[in-house]
Amino acid sequence: DIAALLQPDYYYHAIRNDAGGLVGFCCFGEDAQVPGGDYGLPALDVGLGLHPDLIGTGLSHGFLAAILAFGEEKFAPEFFRATVAVINRRSLHLFERAGFYVVQNFLSGEVRQHRFYVLLRAVAPEERFDPDMPAPAHRQ
């Protein structure tokens, strides 16, 4: 819903390159949650979307790193949390490489249900995201 993205009291942010072109967006807090998940533990929820033309270009790791750095500076959380559709393999791989791990899964949707993973990561200086780190072992 475009109207929701434009609400000033929501935590959506456009991300632009140096030339002013749209790279993607991010959101924080309840705006990044999916109905049906258990969000009882204190953590900063993070959602993102990379411009479709930029997917697969190698920008996603830096994109996520910048979003996490912004979220850490603005909100000072102890943990980051992300909710990702199980079918979104690229996004799951991105978050896992950034040190997130799956803590739950659930179904969401009234008409057509989709399974989601909730992933968590501690915010700690010694655990900063390194885009050159090796990918974790593949999840079964």
Regions found by a protein language model. Give the residues of each.
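Acetyl-CoA-dependent GNAT
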Residues: D1-D53, F70, A122-V123, H138
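Amphipathic alpha-helical recognition patches that constitute DNA-binding helices
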Residues: D45, F79, R90
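Conserved N-terminal entry element of GNAT/NAT acetyltransferase domains
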Residues: L120-Q140
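Conserved catalytic-core motifs of GNAT/GCN5-like acyltransferases
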Residues: T83, G99-F116
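Conserved acetyl-CoA pyrophosphate-binding loop and the N-cap/start of the following alpha-helix
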Residues: L54, G58-I67
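Conserved active-site alpha-helix within GNAT-family acetyltransferase domains
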Residues: H61, V86-Q104
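Short hydrophobic/aromatic beta-strand or adjacent loop that forms the aromatic wall/cage
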Residues: Y10, Q113-L120
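Conserved GNAT acetyl-CoA-binding A-motif
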Residues: E73-V84
